[in-house]
Amino acid sequence: MSHAKFLTRCLQLANYAKGRTSPNPLVGAFIVHNGKIIGEGYHHKAGEPHAEVMAINSVKNPSLLASSTLYCSLEPCAHYGKTPPCSLLITDRRIPKVVIGCSDSNALVNGKGVEHLKSHGVEVLFAEDPAPFRQLNQVFFCNKEHKRPFV
């Protein structure tokens, strides 16, 4: 299956929490091993574990993570807030490849998640078309990029 088809699942997962994650973005993530989804998750609401954490924790055989690909709709965070950085968990679990729907323009992230992953040897790929992922979080992006509500 292509990265584009797999990334569509991220959008589906993220939409499960529509209207409940503010001020955080909607994010879906899952993990593929040998072409099969072995774990998935989404960010349920602010202050709770992020999608990447939910996906990683849902994997029944964690030893498979070291030969798996993580797909996520948004660049993994790289800062400490109410939860620790997802990029740190990804490298701690030795996930070798991450495919991202779109980058996160939040000043706390904005390339830092990708930078952390790459500096730890993780192969990072982006969706060929980030538009559906940006549209998913247009309210979040408007607030972060223009410092105003989405109208």
Regions found by a protein language model. Give the residues of each.
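Phosphate-handling active-site elements
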Residues: 60-67
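Acidic, glycine-enriched active-site microenvironments
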Residues: 24-27, 68
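Short beta-strand scaffold segments in enzyme catalytic cores
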Residues: 27-35
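Zinc-dependent deaminase
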Residues: 1-20, 62, 81-151
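Local cysteine-cluster metal-coordination motifs and their immediate loop/turn environment
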Residues: 42, 49-50, 70-91
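Acidic helix/loop or adjacent segment enriched in Glu/Asp that either coordinates divalent metal
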Residues: 3, 43-59
